[in-house]
Amino acid sequence: MADNKTENTLSSDATEVRAQKLKLLREQIGDVYPAHFHRSLTNAELATRYEGLDPDVETQDIVTVAGRVYSSRNSGMFMDIHDASGKIQIFSHKDVTGEEARALLPMIDIGDIIGVTGIVRRTKRGELTINAQKIEMLTKSLLPMPEKWHGLSDIELRYRKRHLDILTNEDSKLRFQQRSKIVSGIRRFMENDGFMEVETPMLQSIYGGATAEPFKTHHNTLKLDMYLRIAPELFLKRTLVSGLTDKVFEINRNFRNEGVSTRHNPEFTMMECYWAYADYEDMMDLVERLFETLALSIHGTTEFDFGDKRLSFKGPFKRVPMPDAVKEVTGIDFLAIKTDEEARAAAKAAGFAVEKDWTWGECLAFIFEEKVEATLIQPSHVTHFPKDISPFAKEVPGEPRLVERFETYCNAWELGNAFSELNDPEEQRRRMVEQLEQAHARGEKEKQLDEEFLDAIDQGMPPAGGLGIGVDRLIMLLTNAPSIRDVILFPARRSKAD
């Protein structure tokens, strides 16, 4: 085994030093990357077990732990090692540590993963410590940790090398632990509410369920062009038709070949559900119960900070029809406007640039997005959307231009979208044909009518409420993350060459 003079014989380059140490270790101990190591407990379990141990007390208990070296002091006499659950201090001294283990100390660098067996004690200063009797090299790290282990300052590097970001940034580590807790919480909530989870195709021969640009691929064996799904909606509705369950949900990825921003990633996570014999008001109640449950699980309260804002997920949320919201902010009364031409004229008179072929509903939705969204800071349900932009929703009784649809907003972000689902097969076909014609007019020639879905609707779908929630944006709010890339473990990015 190497002695304390080893460092003097090694290169001055940090990476080369580690490579030379690895070579020496291979010569002296053989396997530097063993297949298995048995630890008796995690660092967090150790801390819990000895929480009541008084300062300056040494036990007779021998434990085995493992983790990555994050700091080393006094030539390795004191080391802090971290596992996923926390850290523990390691003490090595000739009075307690075997000669072979002490000889290994000069070969250990920050970032190496080691296993330690020793006696548990608490120092005079109150630090829980293991007096190392045996130290084993489990993984030799060939690269130094970044910036003296205080985290990555380069934002793009954090996304490109997420493993280093989490290794060196406790906030990032906590955020992804919370993400896991939130996704598990959504699944548990839905199951406890009687919903059955299913998995629908990610590769689809006909894309639908939303208006978005898809990713296209080709199946060689089937000789078939296919698309990564933009939404699972049509398959989930077919599941509802099947009678498998009256309450169905899915948590999975959607893909949209569109722009990247602080709120948009081409690959994102959605929770989508359908509830037979319910309507959009039932879905509002479900959203409020779910959001409140998640806030309590992460923060212990329904109120929490996002940036400089104090948000509350305590229901009931504000509910406002879209025409009323637009009238309140802009003064334009869309319910008093009767034609598409009048709607375009009113929008232009108010200073909005609208397209010459836009409908009444498209003008209303555009002005809402331009002027109203930014005012919706606390959780709010915006209801009564235009039918023009909502082909799968039931009409509002007495107002055929509007449908029973809502979107949930918070911090001016859309978090959820829900309908009283259209189940009239003739009306569904008429709207989908109209939507297809509009898509073809925009140049989307590959867009097709999903006859298999329409066939299922002909079979008879029960009245139902449907809901989609953007899981990534919800996690952003609950974890105080300014960008969607902060909550996606490996977000979309340009190649390193770019």
Curated annotation (Swiss-Prot):
It catalyses: tRNA(Lys) + L-lysine + ATP = L-lysyl-tRNA(Lys) + AMP + diphosphate. One of its GO terms (biological process) is lysyl-tRNA aminoacylation. Binds 3 Mg(2+) ions per subunit. Keywords: Aminoacyl-tRNA synthetase, ATP-binding, Cytoplasm, Ligase, Magnesium, Metal-binding, Nucleotide-binding, Protein biosynthesis. It is found in: Cytoplasm. SUPFAM superfamilies: Class II aaRS and biotin synthetases, Nucleic acid-binding proteins. GO terms for molecular function: ATP binding; lysine-tRNA ligase activity; magnesium ion binding; tRNA binding. Signal peptide: none annotated. Its cofactor is Mg(2+). Belongs to the class-II aminoacyl-tRNA synthetase family. Homodimer. This is Lysine--tRNA ligase. It comes from Rhizobium etli (strain ATCC 51251 / DSM 11541 / JCM 21823 / NBRC 15573 / CFN 42).
